[in-house]
């Protein structure tokens, strides 16, 4: 029986171990030998059965990436992704590779991101950049999210309320998979805080948790088998969580489960349905961030743009018939040349507007809206034309 060799490159050893813990859920381990092969690297020799067949794997952990000017390893696993089209300085938590018999070359199988943070506000899209940049290389991508997470009282640290993301964020992974024909999904797993007796989780269907689907997907991917069945299951559960979040979204100006279902079936698109709803763009911006002509610009955007999937995300769509009027008012606020204005008007497509908060002055989060533009591309299309305005509480 030929041994197959894999490497798990992780941001740290925890990510490496967590991936193997997922895999071990669904295999019947006959024998396992774990040893250090260097001061930083662990090797697992595993003999197991899966679906009544016997296999031998060697899995080598490589914790710590070559990034931030570190040279921990001889080769940088991210070089392969960059060569394939990854262009953002955003890296996933872990990458699984298969080591070939010839020249010990590594083939990237998939990338994985873990999230145990509170999925609310801009925190929910801050990692969309690494998903977008990785998937566009043709590399499958799993974003594994611990659910549920609570907002805590700042004084007592007691749980206040369950916080959930805008449903457009998990749906963006489904849309991106359909657009790019490369598998990417948000997979939700049960967190340590999950309490089924909590009235806030009444009627929550725990069958949406994806621990076993993740395991089966990874095992079959590593074995070289067809993974369509498990990809479909993960995407279906991804959609079910979109529906759950949309049911529990506050206010009437959000896509509902029936809306997401129409989009998923291809009956309409996120942009077309947003224009059909005609919800005025309504992103609220803090008064302290209203510098320069931002206040006037936001008024112009509200005049011509509709919110995408809801009213209060920081992006909107200006229908093609409104573009000329919008540009005319915009050039009265900002020194935009005629050539630049003509670039916006030269096609017969809608224009997307994206407002990115550039930084927070306290320094607690110097990239509060990172991932916003990739999130918009994943939700709509990377071929859409987007006008981006970066703002912040700057005095000059």
Which residues does each predicted region cover?
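Charged, often low-complexity linker/regulatory segments
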Residues: 1-28
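Short, flexible loop/turn elements at secondary-structure junctions
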Residues: 10-12, 96-100, 114-118
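Active-site metal-binding core of divalent-cation-utilizing nuclease and nuclease-like domains
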Residues: 34-104, 320
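Non-catalytic C-terminal interaction segments of nucleic acid-processing enzymes
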Residues: 83, 118, 164-396
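Conserved catalytic cores of phosphodiester-cleaving nucleases, focusing on short active-site segments
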Residues: 94-96, 108-116, 131
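Active-site-adjacent loop/helix micro-motif of nuclease/hydrolase catalytic cores
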Residues: 118-128
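Arginine/glycine-rich "motif VI" loop of SF2 helicases in the C-terminal RecA-like domain
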Residues: 133-138, 175-179
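Nucleic-acid nuclease catalytic cores
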Residues: 135-167
């Amino acid at each position: 029986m030929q041994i197959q060799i894999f490497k798990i490159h992780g941001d740290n050893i925890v990510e490496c171990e967590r991936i193997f813990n997922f895999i071990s859920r669904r295999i019947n381990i006959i024998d396992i030998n774990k040893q250090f092969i260097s001061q930083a690297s662990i090797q697992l020799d595993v003999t197991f059965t899966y679906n009544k067949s016997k296999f031998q794997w060697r899995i080598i952990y490589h914790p710590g990436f070559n990034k931030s000017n570190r040279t921990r390893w001889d080769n940088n696993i991210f070089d392969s992704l960059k060569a394939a089209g990854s262009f953002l300085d955003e890296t996933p938590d872990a990458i699984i590779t298969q080591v070939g018999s010839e020249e010990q070359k590594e083939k990237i199988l998939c990338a994985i991101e873990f999230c145990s943070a509170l999925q609310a506000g801009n925190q929910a899209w801050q990692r969309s950049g690494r998903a977008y940049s990785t998937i566009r290389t043709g590399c499958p991508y799993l974003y594994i999210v611990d659910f549920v997470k609570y907002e805590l009282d700042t004084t007592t640290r007691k749980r206040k309320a369950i916080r959930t993301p805008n449903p457009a964020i998990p749906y963006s992974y489904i849309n991106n998979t359909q657009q790019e024909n490369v598998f990417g999904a948000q997979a939700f797993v049960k967190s340590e805080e999950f309490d089924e007796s909590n009235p806030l989780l009444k009627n929550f269907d725990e069958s949406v948790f994806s621990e076993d689907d993740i395991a089966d997907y990874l095992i079959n991917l590593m074995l070289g088998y067809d993974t369509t069945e498990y990809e479909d299951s993960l995407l279906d559960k991804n959609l079910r969580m979109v529906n759950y979040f949309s049911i529990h979204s506050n206010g009437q100006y959000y896509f509902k489960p029936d809306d997401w279902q129409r989009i998923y079936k291809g009956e309409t698109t996120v942009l077309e349905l947003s224009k059909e709803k005609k919800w005025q763009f309504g992103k609220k911006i803090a008064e302290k961030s209203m510098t320069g002509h931002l206040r006037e610009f936001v008024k112009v955007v509200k005049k011509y743009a509709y919110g995408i999937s809801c009213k209060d995300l920081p992006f909107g769509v200006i229908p093609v018939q409104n573009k000329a009027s919008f540009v005319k008012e915009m050039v009265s606020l900002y020194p935009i040349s005629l050539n630049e204005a003509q670039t916006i008007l030269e096609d017969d497509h809608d224009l997307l507007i994206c407002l990115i908060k550039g930084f927070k002055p306290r320094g607690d989060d110097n990239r509060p809206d990172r991932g916003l533009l990739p999130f918009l591309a994943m939700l709509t299309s990377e071929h859409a034309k987007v006008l981006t305005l970066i703002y912040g509480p700057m005095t000059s």
